[in-house]
């Protein structure tokens, strides 16, 4: 499998310009906050400070997994000198740095030149900056773990791939949005089932400190289910997907589409996994397919939020950098615009921005899905012939090397 190297004339971003943009965003956004900050994050920090680390983790006090709370406890001493909001945002900034480092690692696996400059671009992206500097969220941490898992996929290090998947899920349930990609890879490459156990092992390892402190196992096992139970009856919450559009058109009827949305997402995931068994991609193409998996699931699952496309943002950016084409960067820009538009809709600009975001995401998903959507001449399994690469409507294109036999080749 060939290594993808940026081969266009597009220059890497100037580190000085990236730093300037990031600094301006920090200056503007740092004093601002969202309701989640005062309703959840600050009370959790105060619980850790008032009870002490050991006593705080002896009983449930959050609807987040303990993994994030460990980090919150680690930075809690800073609250003696800084206000609680700044402490939480500093942790989010540290998560953003981890995300940039993970991007650097993924670009290294893809053989990208000037990857340090490209990875630094992450900290200046609006969707990343608003997530950390305004909302104080930890989404960058689970996304960083997912990028590491994709890097391990490119390098065919499957135990590490599954371990990073477990780490990602330990921070946020949204990590499962890219699960169809890893499942497809594991099936296609016939990864031994024993190696799959690295994912739950990593997850359990991160839960162990809380369990030892006295956190009830039953509570840990149901945290994500209880998170889902707190969602309102809306079919989507400012998510840039088709269900937000449905909610705008028919707000009273849209919640009844929950079953249809779930079935559509599961069907799309099954289609994705099946098609991945018969099409082989180069290294950059694999990253593009990981982005497609995140776009499909976040785009079709019900009850998605505006922040849930951050993973797709990062994966499609890595794909664009590795391809090094203007078309690839246009696709990444489309996803970034869609994601950021939905965030601004949540922040008060309302339904028009969410609708714009949904339109961008739908277009990007269709473009990204074209390599898998190109059908064979008939419904029979592919022959041993190697047709030319599947081509998106110019200038959008993935360099698909060839189709595999239906039974797989162990690649």
Q: Would you name each region that the model predicts?
A:
Residues 66, 81-101, 252-263:
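Loop-to-helix entry region of an early transmembrane alpha helix in multi-pass inner-membrane enzymes
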Residues 3, 221-240, 273, 290, ...:
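Transmembrane helical bundles and short interhelical boundary loops of multi-pass, membrane-embedded
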Residues 31-46, 59-74, 232-242:
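Extracytoplasmic catalytic/substrate-binding loops of multi-pass membrane glycan-assembly enzymes
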Residues 1-27, 108-119, 282, 288, ...:
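Start-transfer (signal-anchor) and selected internal transmembrane alpha helices
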Residues 101-102, 142-158, 315-316:
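Specific aromatic-rich, kink-prone transmembrane helix
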């Amino acid at each position: 499998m060939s290594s993808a190297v940026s081969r266009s004339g597009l220059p890497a971003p100037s580190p000085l310009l990236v730093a300037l943009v990031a600094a301006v965003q920090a200056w503007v956004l740092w004093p601002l906050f969202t309701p989640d900050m005062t309703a959840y994050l600050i009370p959790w920090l105060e619980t850790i400070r008032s009870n002490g680390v050991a006593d705080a983790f002896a009983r449930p006090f959050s609807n987040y997994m303990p993994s994030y709370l460990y980090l919150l406890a680690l930075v809690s001493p800073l609250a003696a000198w800084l206000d609680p909001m700044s402490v939480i945002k500093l942790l989010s900034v540290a998560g953003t740095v981890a995300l940039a480092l993970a991007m650097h690692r993924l670009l290294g696996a893809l053989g990208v030149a000037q990857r340090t400059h490209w990875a630094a671009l992450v900290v200046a992206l609006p969707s990343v900056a608003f997530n950390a500097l305004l909302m104080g969220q930890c989404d960058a941490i689970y996304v960083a773990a997912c990028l590491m898992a994709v890097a391990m996929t490119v390098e065919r290090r499957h135990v590490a791939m599954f371990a990073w998947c477990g780490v990602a899920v330990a921070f946020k349930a949204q990590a499962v949005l890219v699960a169809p990609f890893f499942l497809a890879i594991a099936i296609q490459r016939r990864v031994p089932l024993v190696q799959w156990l690295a994912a739950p092992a990593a997850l359990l390892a991160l839960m162990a400190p809380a369990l030892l402190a006295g956190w009830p196992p039953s509570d840990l096992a149901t945290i994500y289910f209880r998170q889902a139970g707190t969602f309102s009856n809306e079919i989507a919450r400012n998510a840039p997907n088709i269900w937000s559009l449905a909610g705008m058109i028919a707000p009273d009827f849209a919640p009844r589409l929950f079953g249809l949305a779930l079935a559509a997402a599961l069907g799309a995931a099954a289609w994705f996994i099946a098609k991945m068994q018969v099409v082989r991609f180069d290294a950059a193409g694999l990253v593009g397919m990981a982005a497609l998996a995140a776009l499909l699931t976040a785009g079709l699952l019900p009850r998605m939020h505006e922040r849930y496309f951050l993973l797709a943002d990062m994966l499609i950016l890595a794909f664009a950098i590795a391809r090094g084409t203007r078309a690839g960067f246009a696709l990444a820009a489309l996803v970034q615009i869609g994601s950021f538009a939905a965030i601004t809709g949540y922040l008060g600009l309302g339904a028009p921005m969410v609708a714009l975001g949904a339109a961008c995401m739908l277009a990007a998903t269709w473009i990204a899905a074209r390599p898998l959507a190109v059908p064979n001449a008939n419904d029979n399994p592919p022959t041993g012939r190697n047709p030319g690469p599947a081509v998106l409507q110019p200038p959008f294109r993935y360099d698909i090397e060839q189709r595999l036999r239906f039974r797989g080749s162990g690649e």
